[in-house]
Amino acid sequence: MTSGKQAAINAALADVGNSYATGWNQPGECLVSVRRWLAAGGINFGYGDPNSGYVASGATQVSWSNVQPGDVVQYESAYSPDSWIGGVHTVLVTGVSGGSVQIVEANNPGGSGYVSSNSNWSPAPPAGFRAVVWRFPG
């Protein structure tokens, strides 16, 4: 793992237990939180929609079977991947061990702005959504 991804993971883990304001582009939103954690590692996650923002940042899609610490999992609409609609969610993978995936996420439950971790996580997107794993350079 690169030092940048380790720094991003460390920033996310240090944020667990904090709560932030929510609303469009507020620090408690899941995507804004993941962007903040990646930036702590010097990883650029530019602005855009749920799909195009990753592509514009140089991230590439990888399969769930290849997920690694530092990857980002994005729930996106299966019908309109670049739409900001209810059900979109973003998490940072902080560890993978023996088939178990650890993540840090913000704003779950929605509207809470709460940052939490989960040590045995697997994607469970809502109906009509899919989970996409993105790997950033750096």
Residue ranges and their predicted role:
Residues S3, Y20, G87-G138:
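Aromatic- and glycine-rich peptidoglycan recognition patches
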